[in-house]
Amino acid sequence: MKNYDELSSMEIDTLREIGSIGTGNAATALSQMLGREVNITLPQVRIMGYNEAIDWIGGPEAITAGVLVKMSGEISGIMLSVQPLEFANLVLESILGLSAKDYSELESMETSALVEVGNIMISTFINALAGLSGLTVDLTVPAFTIDMQGAILAFGSQSDYIMTIGGDFICDNKQVPCRLLLSPDIRSLNFLLRKLGVDSGE
């Protein structure tokens, strides 16, 4: 059974393809929800160590919002949508006609909008993964938190390695960061690769 750091180049390329398709679907879902055209730059999909992933999303002490969903069924693990303030304001301006200078200004109506958007993006991504692999994946009710990024990632961490999916959403000639993190447990990672037909069985 392979760990993340033992994946072959073909296996990593397959995960990248899933990440690209899933992120494209998430951008389409976001566009429909906001009622605005939203495109995404070519996403960068990487397998990162835990500490590298924290630095990638902005460092351990930066405050951010996160929507986390746990996966069960034929795949177990977590998926996390990190919502930098620029992304949060894109959502809030589109849905509620307001923006926030920092996360402390958010009230229940604003956080509910962010949770709904994060949940739809994650669900759309996972549905794409399930469709490509033929697997059944169940998702929990999303959890929402505002905290230091290191704490958010520690809460959801399933292993020492994480699949990171990053790009920029483009809306009204503005670019806002898209940061998604997928962490199936090791058993699920290997099962997924077998279902996709690329597990070398080493």
Go through the PLM ranges and name each one.
Residues 2-27, 31-202:
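Composition-driven recognition of glycine/serine/threonine/acidic- and proline-rich low-complexity segments
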